[in-house]
Swiss-Prot record:
Its main location: membrane. It is a multi-pass membrane protein. The lineage of its organism: Bacteria, Pseudomonadati, Pseudomonadota, Alphaproteobacteria, Hyphomicrobiales. It comes from Rhizobium leguminosarum. It catalyses: ATP + protein L-histidine = ADP + protein N-phospho-L-histidine. Residues 412-622 form the Histidine kinase domain. The chain crosses the membrane at residues 25-42, 321-338. GO terms for molecular function: ATP binding; phosphorelay sensor kinase activity. Keywords: ATP-binding, Cell inner membrane, Cell membrane, Kinase, Membrane, Nucleotide-binding, Phosphoprotein, Transferase, Transmembrane, Transmembrane helix, Two-component regulatory system. This is C4-dicarboxylate transport sensor protein DctB. Residues 1-24, 339-622 are cytoplasmic. The gene is dctB. The keyword Kinase applies. CDD domains: HisKA (cd00082). One of its GO terms (cellular component) is plasma membrane. Residues 43-320 are periplasmic.
């Protein structure tokens, strides 16, 4: 009783080593699964971050290019204006005359021009640096009467003829770009005309986009920006002596020229950085993608910032979700397989005693299987032998079909040979007579004619002899034109009175197909013979066409006739052995022809109705 209980217990519960092994495998699986999840989350996060940054970079480069184009358009719009005004003779005459009334009328003209071009201010400075006319002459902040000798744009225009200078207005306290042009007369310098361009509209457009943009000069000072608090700040520290010189020039008024709250994180390439910036109103730093591009025809650079946080976080989140969607089913599948493996192990452990009985039965069954295997091998050998015999029979059928065709054309060939033989006899008699008379020249001509006739007989018999051979069955490059001409030659004698019904479009000499010439001639002879017999009742109205075409590595040969067509009951089993409508036919010609074409990787199809029949043969192009 105790032994029975122990036996049942051993079957229900696995052994202690097996329990330890199962527990150890589950701990290993848990550790590997944890590592796989961590690695997957980290890798997918990196990939998601890279893809998100790449997408942001592409968008940022497009945006910075558009912003630079907008800024360039504004600059080009106003650059021509000072030059045109400097060529105005009325303006030069006013400076020469130095009359207050003339200057007032000039101010009115400049006022209209500034309103039409939307320039901030247009004003004229005499050679002493005093503004004599201005478009804002009616306003409290009028430039008229102010001294601008210290301004770089005045000095540059006097020295070089034209100048551009970005600065804070000393009167208006508004920043802008001053574009100046020298006015010259016959006696030299008369004065300078200046157009001030303010970028309020450009900054408003940038601000509306929701992404910060700003322009810095060659010293790194912010000139134009969508964030007003950043104006006249710097993207890096400027040497103290240069800061003193800038402040003394009053170019930016009393601006402190402090560095932007910007830290470089890493460089991603030319004109592309990842930076951290403390935005106005924010306590912490925000990470941005900083894309830079130069502004043509200036020393400026346009910087465009795109926040990385939301887009990159979304990209990382999506990539990690996708990774988990892929990984978790795999882990679940692995757990299922592991559980299944343990179940099998437990089952094996519980059935340990039954295994010996099973092995004994396996030994018995192995003997039966060995005997069955021997019988199966014997059957396989028998099947292979039968298959070889079948192939031999098929080859014999092909050869028999070829010889049957040869027998059909033999009578006609004999007739065709009899004619040149009779002619040869006549030429030989004539040659003997000429030789008896000593006339060697006519005798030689007769002998040459005999030689030509023997060559003709030789070509006919050679074609018959070649066709009668079995030939090699393997596929090789074969000229399609030679196949067609050979088949027609063999049929010419038998169908001597009906060969004019043939309409053959011979392919080019270089067109070759994969096959054996003799076997392909046999296919074509079968098809032409059927077609010529089908149109025989139509006498002169019968027509048999041979056409070739190539497409996608295949060559198509079409044999078409305008005969009565193939009856429906015959057409259904057309390629079935012994299916024929001819009283003397065996119904094997088309079957063999289709097998030959199939052996070379081609196919044969038929289309038939009351208007005629078309056989389409497709062969691989060599």
């Amino acid at each position: 009783m105790h032994k029975s209980a122990m036996s049942v217990s051993q079957k229900l519960w696995p052994s202690l080593p097996l329990q330890h092994r199962i527990r150890r495998m589950w701990w290993t699986y848990a550790a590997l699964a944890f590592l796989a999840v961590v690695a997957s989350l980290w890798t997918s996060g990196e990939i998601g971050q890279h893809r998100a940054e790449a997408a942001l970079e592409e968008q940022a480069r497009m945006d910075v290019t558009l912003n630079a184009a907008l800024l360039r358009t504004v600059l080009e719009k106003y650059r021509a204006l000072p030059f045109v005004l400097s060529q105005d003779t009325a303006l030069a005459a006013a400076l020469v005359g130095n009359d207050a009334g003339t200057f007032e009328r000039l101010s009115q003209k400049l006022e209209i021009l500034a309103a039409g071009t939307k320039a901030a201010v247009i004003y004229v400075i005499d050679k002493d640096g005093i503004a004599v006319s201005a478009s804002n002459w009616r306003e409290p902040t009028s430039f008229v009467g102010n001294d601008y000798r210290f301004r770089e744009y005045f000095q540059g225009a006097v020295e070089r003829g034209q100048a551009e200078h970005f600065a804070l207005g000393t009167v208006s306290k508004k920043p802008g770009l001053y574009i100046s042009q020298r006015i010259s007369g016959s006696n030299g310098l008369l004065g300078v005309v200046v157009v001030k361009v303010e970028f309020d509209d450009v900054e408003a457009d940038w601000n509306a986009s929701g992404t910060p943009s700003y322009v810095v000069d060659e010293r790194g000072i912010v000139l134009i920006t969508s964030l007003p608090s950043w104006r006249f700040m710097t993207i890096g520290r400027i040497a103290e002596d240069r800061l003193t010189a800038i402040r003394e020039s009053l170019q930016f008024g009393a601006a402190p020229l402090q560095p932007l709250p910007l830290d470089m994180v890493r460089n991603l390439g030319e004109g592309l950085d990842v930076v951290e910036i403390v935005m106005p109103g924010d306590a912490g730093k925000t990470r941005f993608l900083d894309v830079a591009t130069s502004v043509p025809a200036t020393g400026w650079h346009l910087q465009h910032l795109v926040a990385l946080g939301p887009s990159v976080d979304a990209g990382i989140r999506e990539a990690r979700m996708l990774a988990l969607l892929i990984l978790l089913p795999l882990l679940a599948g692995a757990a299922f397989l592991l559980r299944r493996r343990h179940t099998i192990a437990l089952r094996i452990s519980s059935e340990q005693q039954a295994r010996e009985e099973l092995e004994r039965r396996v030994v018995e069954r192995t003997l039966d299987l060995s005997q069955a295997r021997d019988r199966l091998q014997a059957e396989i050998i028998g099947h292979k032998s039968t298959e070889q015999k079948l192939q031999a029979v098929q080859q014999d059928l092909v050869q028999a079909n070829r010889l049957a065709i040869l027998g059909q054309v033999a009578a006609g060939v004999a007739h065709e040979i009899n004619q040149p033989v009779a002619t040869i006899r006549a030429y030989a008699d004539n040659a003997r007579t000429f030789l008896d008379r000593g006339q060697t020249a006519p005798a030689g001509e007769n002998l040459e004619s005999i030689a030509a006739l023997t060559e003709r007989i030789g070509s006919i018999t050679e074609e018959l002899k070649t066709f009668a051979r079995k030939g090699r069955g393997s596929a090789e490059p074969t000229g399609l034109k030679d196949v067609i001409e050979g088949a027609v030659m063999l049929l010419r004698s038998r169908f001597a009175g009906r060969m004019d019904t043939l309409d053959i479009d011979l392919p080019p000499d270089e067109l070759q197909v994969m096959g054996n010439r003799i076997r392909l001639e046999q296919v074509l002879i079968n098809l032409l013979q059927n077609a010529l017999e089908a149109v025989a009742p139509k006498a002169g109205e019968g027509r048999v066409e041979i056409r070739t075409s190539t497409d996608a590595g295949m060559v198509t040969v079409t044999v078409a006739d305008n005969g009565p067509g193939i009856p429906t009951e015959i057409r259904k089993g057309l390629f079935t052995p012994f299916n024929t409508s001819k009283e003397s036919g065996l119904g094997l010609g088309l079957v063999i022809s289709k097998d030959i074409v199939g052996d070379y990787g081609g196919r044969m199809d038929v289309a038939s109705d009351s208007g005629g029949t078309r056989f389409i043969v497709q062969l691989r192009k060599a």
